[in-house]
Amino acid sequence: MSTNPKPQRKTKRNTNRRPQDVKFPGGGQIVGGVYLLTRRGPRLGVRATRKTSERSQPRGRRQPIPKARRPEGRAWAQPGYPWPLYGNEGLGWAGWLLSPRGSRPSWGPTDPRRRSRNLGKVIDTLTCGFADLMGYIPLVGAPLGGASRALAHGVRVLEDGVNYATGNLPGCSFSIFLSALMSCLTAPASAYEVRNVSGIYHVTNDCSNSSIAYEAAGMIMHTPGCVPCVREDNSSRCWVALTPTLAARNASVPTTTIRRHVDLLVGAATLCSAMYVGDLCGSVFLVSQLITFSPRRYETVQDCNCSLYPGHVSGHRMAWDMMMNWSPTAALVVSQLLRIPQAVVDIVAGAHWGVLAGLAYYPMVGNWAKVLIVMLLFAGVDGANTHTVGGTEGFTTQRFTSLFTLGPSQKIQLINTNGSWHINRTALNCNDSFKTGFLAALFYVHKFNASGCPEHMASCRPIDKFDQGWGPVTYAEPSISEQRPYCWHYAPRPCGTIPASEVCGPVYCFTPSPVVVGTTDRF
């Protein structure tokens, strides 16, 4: 039995339909579905095909193939022949220089405008149009046009990189509108503020006029790392720093007004993103920033020498002050992150519907980076209950860690000179010998340096030596001889206000242990 398949009968369905050759009376014909014209006589280098009627006759002498006739006379300046002394190359370069590229712009498939979208269309139209315009210039149009085209392609490469970074990374789909908000509400961190006094520049913490971003009723928004010094009624005073970028006349000024601004802006950004016109809104917002004029409400000067935080300059306050000077950006980010929990409560309690809409919409579309930006924006102006940024957290940590403080590691010795006790002629602060934590003193008593303690306590006055009186409570004015911090009745002298013009150098000295010299609080 054969295994070959059974032959099928050819029908109209299984028959391969091949085009038939058709000849036309005019001489043309269709061969294999292609229309061919009749050849009119032999060409140079090609032998003529014999006619059908001539095939039965004997072939005559083969005709030679005609060749092109060599021209007579000069050989240069002819098609295919060079000019003498490299004239052909020179004239070619001359023609390339004299013919502007703009008369025949052809970007081809690599045209940057083919891959543009949103704001990129505007940028690529400007760069490519500039390249075409440069090509119209005679003599230098060709090289300038080529360089401009290369520049346009380079800009397009940068745009592709930005589009990839902001569109393909999870949760990092930024819009121009939020970038515009960041440029308005959080000014870039500056390095140091300086003031010019008779041609001499001094480093100061007072904000310059260029550091002021926005002024409202009783509040000033500024760059981080400085504090506004406002002149009112012929006197200059430092304003209270509510946040690293927001200062108020006093700590009781509510920040509701500036927070409503943020609420409105975030709500507008959310609406633009939901309507897929975020880039258009951002472009309009950025352009409006260039033409918006905000009148000055206050006169900011630089003769206060403000501290970055008001009040007594403690060690932790001093450390935060130095951090603000060293890295204003890091201090700004840390302070805003620490305020996010309180900002969440204020958003809900204050009914900030624009911020709530943004926090509800952006997680649904997976833009978690925008959620963080909105929280940082609101935390940057959430200073209603904030008096010192980072100072509260630092003071709380200091109170807890002070229980375990072992005191100074240096073995000190107290010396009694004319009734006053001093520390062995070192630069250590006298109070450091008594800064041993309570728990550390209980469990590490053998390591606690208690030299001179009995003598110290013996010089303290008993309670019956104090004055008895009645009436309102007032501040005592102890004499210099009564300044004994080791006694239980020690009362420090009240802090006074020192004008900045009378302070030469820093307000505190850095010895082996920081010693606070004074502060220039001017309220």
UniProtKB/Swiss-Prot annotation:
InterPro entries: HCV_Core_C (IPR002521), HCV_core_chain_A (IPR044896), HCV_core_N (IPR002522), HCV_Env (IPR002519), HCV_NS1 (IPR002531). The lineage of its organism: Viruses, Riboviria, Orthornavirae, Kitrinoviricota, Flasuviricetes. GO terms for biological process: clathrin-dependent endocytosis of virus by host cell; fusion of virus membrane with host endosome membrane; symbiont-mediated suppression of host innate immune response; virion attachment to host cell. The keyword Transmembrane helix applies. The record marks 177-178, 191-192, 383-384 as: Cleavage. Keywords: Acetylation, Apoptosis, Capsid protein, Clathrin-mediated endocytosis of virus by host, Fusion of virus membrane with host endosomal membrane, Fusion of virus membrane with host membrane, Glycoprotein, Host cytoplasm, Host endoplasmic reticulum, Host lipid droplet, Host membrane, Host mitochondrion, Host nucleus, Host-virus interaction, Inhibition of host innate immune response by virus, Interferon antiviral system evasion, Membrane, Oncogene, Phosphoprotein, Ribonucleoprotein, RNA-binding, Transmembrane, Transmembrane helix, Ubl conjugation, Viral attachment to host cell, Viral envelope protein, Viral immunoevasion, Viral nucleoprotein, Viral penetration into host cytoplasm, Virion, Virus endocytosis by host, Virus entry into host cell. It comes from Hepatitis C virus (isolate HCV-476) (HCV). Residues 7-16, 58-68 have a biased composition (Basic residues). Belongs to the hepacivirus polyprotein family. Residues 112-152 are annotated as: Important for endoplasmic reticulum and mitochondrial localization. Viral particle assembly takes place at the surface of ER-derived membranes in close proximity to lipid droplets. NS2 associates with E1/E2 glycoproteins, NS3 and NS5A, which interacts with the viral RNA and core protein to promote genome encapsidation. The nucleocapsid buds at the ER membrane where E1/E2 glycoproteins are anchored and afterward associate with nascent lipid droplet to acquire APOE and APOC. Secretion of viral particles is probably regulated by viroporin p7. It comes from the Viruses. Residues 2-75 are annotated as: Disordered. Residues 385-411 are annotated as: HVR1. Residues 178-191 form a propeptide. Residues 2-168 are cytoplasmic. A motif (Nuclear localization signal) lies at residues 5-13, 38-43, 58-64, 66-71. Residues 2-58 are annotated as: Interaction with EIF2AK2/PKR. One of its GO terms (cellular component) is host cell nucleus. Residues 122-173 are annotated as: Interaction with APOA2. Residues 265-296 are annotated as: Important for fusion. This is Genome polyprotein. Residues 480-493 are annotated as: CD81-binding 1. The chain crosses the membrane at residues 169-189, 359-379. One of its GO terms (molecular function) is RNA binding. The modification N-acetylserine is found at residue 2.
